[in-house]
């Protein structure tokens, strides 16, 4: 399926960082090279396992409020502390919506802050 940087996509199959299989999850496309995508996971607030207040305060979780542009059904967070890479365009079921260039910049800034914090440890 065709998609662009900044699109919110529903992915059919992917691998979690621990190697286990994942399916039917939403992501934001942050980079495209050839037929492979780099993605940041999007989490609906109601799906977060621990307290929403704790998750909202994590510096690498950037809130994404639902609106007509991104076409989300619920307010969400983009988890900017991990990039899923090598996802094939064939694994995209649908494009849900899109984020603004400013929001995409915020996601990259949060990821860079995460990497900087890792370097300090």
Task: Enumerate the language-model features and the residues they cover.
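Extreme N-terminus of proteins, especially the signal/transit-peptide cleavage junction
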Residues: 1-2, 111
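A residue-level detector for short acidic-glycine micro-motifs
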Residues: 10, 29-31, 82
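Compact nucleic-acid interaction/catalytic patches
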Residues: 18-68
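C-terminal terminal-subdomain/extension
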Residues: 66-121
